[in-house]
Amino acid sequence: MSKVYDWFNDRLEIQGIADDITSKYVPPHVNIFYCIGGITFTCFIMQVASGFAMTFYYRPTVTEAFASVQYIMTDVNFGWLIRSIHKWSASMMVLTMILHVFRVYLTGGFKKPRELTWVTGVILAVCTVSFGVTGYSLPWDQVGYWAVKIVTGVPDAIPVIGAPLVELLRGGVGVGQSTLTRFYSLHTFVLPLLTAVFMLAHFLMIRKQGISGPL
C-alpha cells in the first residue's frame, strides 16, 4: 500500500498538500460562530446529494410534478427521508447563511483586503435565496403555483423592461409548463453550478487571506 501512496506522492505531492491543509494557522480569537459558514456549506452538500436522489423520480411537468412528489414520499424506499432531509437542510442553509452574514459584518470581515470575499459571499447569499424561490415551485401544488405567480409578477412594476422581464421569467404571458421548466433548470443546473463556482472562489480567497482578525 505504501508503494502505491509513494507513486502518487512523487507525482502529485500529496503529502505537501495534506501538510498545508492540516497545518494552517487558526487565530486564537476564533470561536464557534466562525464555524457557521462551514455549516452552511455542509447544508449545501446535503442539498446536492438529496436533490440528486430525487431527480430519479421527480417529473417536471405541470400534470405529473405533484404526483411524482407524492410517489417519492409514499412509494420510494426512504423517499420520505430523502425529501425531508432536502427540505430541512434547505431551511437550515438559509438560517445559517443569514447568521454567517451577520457574523462577518459584525466582526468586520468585509474590510480590506477581503472585499472580494465579501462580494462572492453576497452572490452566494443571492443564490441561496434563489434556490428557495425556485425549489418552492417544483411540487407544483397550490402554494407553489401561487408563489411563482406572485414572485414572477414582481418585476412587472419596473418601467419599460418590467413586462418583458416577467415574460422571460415565466416563459410566456402566463404561468405554466414553460415556467416550471425554467425553474427546474435553474434549481437543478444553473444555480448549483454558479454556487459551486463562487464557493470555490470564496474558499480560495479565505485560504489565501486567512481568517480576519478580532475587532
From Swiss-Prot:
Major place of residence: plastid
Record field: transmembrane: 32-52, 90-110, 116-136, 186-206
Any one Gene Ontology molecular-function term assigned to this protein's record: oxidoreductase activity
Any Pfam family: Cytochrome_B
Names of the cofactor(s): heme b; heme c
Cofactor note: Binds 2 heme b groups non-covalently with two histidine residues as axial ligands. Binds one heme group covalently by a single cysteine link with no axial amino acid ligand. This heme was named heme ci.
Positions annotated to bind heme b 2: 86, 187
Cellular localization per UniProt: Plastid, Chloroplast thylakoid membrane
Lineage summary: Eukaryota, Viridiplantae, Streptophyta, Mesostigmatophyceae, Mesostigmatales
Function recorded in the entry: Component of the cytochrome b6-f complex, which mediates electron transfer between photosystem II (PSII) and photosystem I (PSI), cyclic electron flow around PSI, and state transitions.
Note: Heme 1 (or BH or b566) is high-potential and absorbs at about 566 nm, and heme 2 (or BL or b562) is low-potential and absorbs at about 562 nm.
PROSITE patterns according to UniProt: CYTB_NTER
One Gene Ontology term, aspect cellular component: chloroplast thylakoid membrane
Superkingdom of source: Eukaryota
Disulfide bond residue pairs: none
Keywords: Chloroplast, Electron transport, Heme, Iron, Membrane, Metal-binding, Photosynthesis, Plastid, Thylakoid, Transmembrane, Transmembrane helix, Transport
Signal sequence coordinates: none
Keyword Iron assigned: yes
Protein residues bound to heme c: 35
Protein name: Cytochrome b6
Family as reported in the entry's similarity comment: Belongs to the cytochrome b family. PetB subfamily.
Organism from which the protein derives: Mesostigma viride
Positions bound to heme b 1: 100, 202
